[in-house]
Amino acid sequence: MRLTPLPAFDNNYIWTLIAPDGRAIIVDPGQALPILEAHSKGLIPTAILLTHHHADHIGGVPELLERWPTLPIYAPHDTRIALNYHRIGEGDSLNILGLRFQVIHTPGHTHSHLTFIGNDLLFCGDTLFSLGCGQIFEGTPTQMLASLQRLAALPIQTRVCCGHEYTLSNAAFALHVDPTNTALQKRRQQANAMRLANLPTLPISLESELNTNPFLRTAAPTIHAATATHLQRTPIDEVEVFATLRHWKNNFPIKNIP
């Protein structure tokens, strides 16, 4: 199977897993056009997986259904997803094109957000980003941290497939928080070179994220110290460290911060 991220909008990725015969699993098609263009080159949509209800992740589905009306769709229980689809949730598993994916509930960004795990791949939508995490629109910091900790416990060789290309803007904030992290410094240099070459910085290994993403390192002394300095007091617990990081980033002066 070939894993390919298809760019959409300004910074979204539509993830595709393509079999040798062209049949493909599609994750979060916010736009139809990238899929239609890939179809002209041999891609055959076989199933759609949706992580959450936001338009930039599901907006292309109606047009794709016009072309492939029997295409199966798997998505969370959420009345805001106005489609005919298979409702799935925590503990479910999917077997598509010979691949098995576990479904886990990862609330925080939205109440019903799902993540798909299998075959050393992690399709995490807007929960975990390269060097960052999603904004907390509907959940709580406690929920979001718990979701991230579940993902952090996966095998380190897992490849993280996020919904957006945010690595460079996330790196700026991460380095502001953790400036002496040499692995993080190296990642920013690598990501900058990749983006200059118009290459995606994803997927990225979970091992790399564990070493460089401040939102996965809330127990690390350097991250704890940085949030204490920002708060001008000692954080109460790890949840407050995380909540402080998220609020801090929300107000960090860089364009296109997620």
From Swiss-Prot:
Q: What class of enzyme is it?
A: hydrolase
Binding-site positions, Zn(2+) 1: 52, 54, 109, 126
Might you give the EC number(s) for this enzyme? 3.1.2.6
- Which reaction(s) does the protein catalyse, per the Swiss-Prot or TrEMBL entry? an S-(2-hydroxyacyl)glutathione + H2O = a 2-hydroxy carboxylate + glutathione + H(+)
Which residues of the sequence carry a binding annotation for Zn(2+) 2? 56-57, 126, 164
Q: Which GO terms describe its biological process?
A: methylglyoxal catabolic process to D-lactate via S-lactoyl-glutathione
Which UniProt keyword terms apply here? Hydrolase, Metal-binding, Zinc
The UniProt entry, under InterPro entries, shows:
Clx_II_MBL (IPR035680), Glyoxalase_II_hydrolase (IPR050110), HAGH_C (IPR032282), Hydroxyacylglutathione_Hdrlase (IPR017782), Metallo-B-lactamas (IPR001279), RibonucZ/Hydroxyglut_hydro (IPR036866)
Q: Which cofactor does it need?
A: Zn(2+)
Its UniProt pathway annotation is: Secondary metabolite metabolism; methylglyoxal degradation; (R)-lactate from methylglyoxal: step 2/2
| UniProt-listed SMART domains | Lactamase_B
Q: Which GO terms describe its molecular function?
A: hydroxyacylglutathione hydrolase activity; metal ion binding
Sorted alphabetically, which HAMAP family does this protein's record hold? Glyoxalase_2
Indicate the family of this protein: Belongs to the metallo-beta-lactamase superfamily. Glyoxalase II family.
Name used for this protein in its record: Hydroxyacylglutathione hydrolase
Species assigned in the record = Xylella fastidiosa (strain 9a5c)
The lineage is:
Bacteria, Pseudomonadati, Pseudomonadota, Gammaproteobacteria, Lysobacterales
